[in-house]
From Swiss-Prot:
Organism classification: Bacteria, Pseudomonadati, Bacteroidota, Bacteroidia, Bacteroidales
Cofactor annotation remark: Binds 2 magnesium ions per tetramer.
InterPro entries registered for this protein in UniProt: aa-tRNA-synth_II, aa-tRNA-synth_II/BPL/LPL, Phe-tRNA-synth_IIc_asu, Phe-tRNA_ligase_II_N, Phe_tRNA_ligase_alpha1_bac, Phenylalanyl-tRNA_Synthase, tRNA-bd_arm
Gene: pheS
Keyword flag Manganese: no
Organism: Bacteroides fragilis (strain ATCC 25285 / DSM 2151 / CCUG 4856 / JCM 11019 / LMG 10263 / NCTC 9343 / Onslow / VPI 2553 / EN-2)
Domain of life: Bacteria
Xref: CDD domains: PheRS_alpha_core (cd00496)
Name of the protein described by the UniProt record: Phenylalanine--tRNA ligase alpha subunit
Length: 339
């Protein structure tokens, strides 16, 4: 029996396994109830009395080494498995969720699509602008309140440079390098020096449109406005134009639509008037055309501008404008079905 034990000791010392399945086969072969070591234990009762001490010590040594070898191989495979699940420090600590389109992007694209079908092309310009394109070229007087630091963000090191207060500056840039017919729509971010509240923000988004050609009339403007209102808010939408003032248009007007919440009957949202203001518009002032190199005696045009937040607010009844810039996924997910 001593010879048999020594043979098994050599085998156990040389045990190898390529994977956990092979290791389980070896465990069964040597350490299970029907394994080789247990068979020797069963034969131990037949050993002569004078050899029992020596054989017993050898059997215990064999069993211990076999168990240690199997455990060592098992630990090796366990470490390999754990290595496959090591902590990835590049992964986010928060669950990664699929994004959705921002409500402002949804409405912006709707507005662009409506005007694109009318033949308008997209024009864009810089958000950091000069005084000429934001004010002077658009007929703003030297003492106009918009030029004051209370309303506009100026660049401290360059007094004539500022964050644009409207996308009308894009219209000026297009007119000074183009000749009519001009038919453009100008979406973009603008900045105003205003206190942040549920009704106002220091930055927001605008879309402005400009059409310049021969014999453009206020009637053309009104038809475009009516079509836009019906496309954006529904076929039953009514519009009304109220006289107003803007430096770059004459005559100027503000456009209201019949309240899309109460159907024009009156509610808290429309202050019980049945009407809600959505944009400003008018015929391009001849001084603006001339300042930008277009002969006002030959050409005329109209312009209109609206806040994207305002239109989104009306479409989806968002009461707090700050929610558009807070990036709260709970709020944004409410618009998944909107596109």
């Amino acid at each position: 029996m001593i010879a048999k034990i020594n043979q098994l000791l050599e085998e156990v010392g040389a045990l190898k396994a390529a994977n956990a399945e092979e290791l389980e086969v070896l465990r069964i072969k040597y350490l299970s109830k029907k394994g080789a070591i247990n068979d020797l234990m069963a034969d131990f009762r037949n050993v002569a009395a004078e050899q029992k001490k020596e054989v017993g010590m050898k059997l215990n040594e064999l069993k211990t080494k076999a168990q240690e070898k199997i455990n060592a191989l098992k630990e090796q495979f366990d470490n390999q498995d754990n290595g496959q699940d090591d902590l990835d420090l590049t992964r986010s600590a928060y669950p990664v969720e699929l994004g959705t389109r921002h409500p402002l992007s949804i409405v912006r694209n709707e507005i662009i699509d409506i005007f694109a079908r009318l033949g308008f092309n997209i024009a864009e310009g810089p958000e950091i602008e000069d005084d000429w394109h934001v004010f002077s070229a658009l007929n703003f007087a030297e003492d106009h309140p918009a030029r004051d630091m209370q309303d506009t963000f100026f660049i401290e090191s360059h007094p004539d440079v500022l964050l644009r207060t409207h996308t009308s500056s894009v219209q000026s840039r297009v007119m000074e390098v183009s000749q009519p017919p001009i038919r453009i729509i100008c979406p973009g971010r603008v900045y105003r020096n205003e206190a942040i509240s549920y009704r106002a923000h220091c930055f927001f988004h605008q879309v402005e449109a400009l059409y310049v050609d021969r014999n453009v009339s206020f009637t053309d403007l009104k038809q475009v406005l009516l079509l836009f209102a019906k496309e954006m808010f529904g076929a039953d939408t009514k519009i009304r134009l109220r006289p107003s003032y803007f430096p770059f248009t004459e005559p100027s007007a503000e456009m209201d639509i019949s309240c899309n919440i109460c159907g024009g009957k009156g509610c808290p949202f429309c202050k019980h008037t049945g009407w809600v203001e959505i944009l400003g518009c008018g015929m391009v002032d001849p001084n603006v055309l001339d300042a930008n190199g277009i002969d006002s005696k030959v050409y005329s045009g109209y312009a209109l501008g609206m806040g994207i937040e305002r239109i989104t607010n009306l479409k989806y009844q968002v009461k707090d404008l700050r929610m558009f810039s807070e990036n709260d996924t709970r709020f944004l997910k409410e618009f998944e079905a909107a596109y």
